[in-house]
Amino acid sequence: VYGVDGGAEKGEFLKSLGATGYVDFTTTPNLIEKVKEITNGGADAVIVTAANPKAFVQAADMLVVGGTLSCVGIPSERGFLETPISSIVIKSLHITGNLVGSLKECLEAVDLVRRGIVKPKVTVRPFEDLPEIYKELERGEILGRIVLKIAKDE
């Protein structure tokens, strides 16, 4: 499993979660070629959680014949997959979308966390931080997930 994101801090974070390696798109001149190089010809599957539509097109180009593109993120602008149909057909790509998993998948995910196999990064912050959290999200500075605490401690 390789992670692709921007910045050294994100790379360290992904490796701490168990990624084999990391590619920083901000410092890699040809991201698609780099991924093909480290995966010996292309990835079997790419899961895109990015909000940038360009990430979806690049991901499709990183796949091997018969590869799977899993779209999880929803682009904030022009939400279209602008990959040539000929590429999808010739490479026999599988394209899936998933916003929320099934109950079974959610229970499996909770079990992985419970057994310590998956260690999510969760930061609890006060509800009053919400405007700043949005700014941090826009700048790509959030690692993991933020949980907003609404109730005051008594």
Annotated model-derived regions:
Residues 15-16, 57-61, 82-84, 108-110:
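Short amphipathic alpha-helical segments
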Residues 63-65:
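Helix-to-beta-strand junctions that scaffold the AdoMet/dcAdoMet cofactor pocket
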Residues 67-70, 82-122:
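Rossmann-fold dehydrogenase core element
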Residues 57, 103-154:
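C-terminal hydrophobic helical "lid"/dimerization subdomain
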Residues 52-53, 74-77, 153-154:
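Short glycine-rich anion-binding loops that position phosphate/pyrophosphate groups of nucleotides
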Residues 1-58:
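Adenosine-nucleotide cofactor-binding segment
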Residues 5-13, 78-85, 106:
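Short, glycine/polar-rich helix-capping loops at beta-to-alpha or helix-loop-helix junctions
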Residues 7, 75, 101:
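Residues in the short beta-alpha loop(s) of Rossmann-like NAD(P)-binding domains
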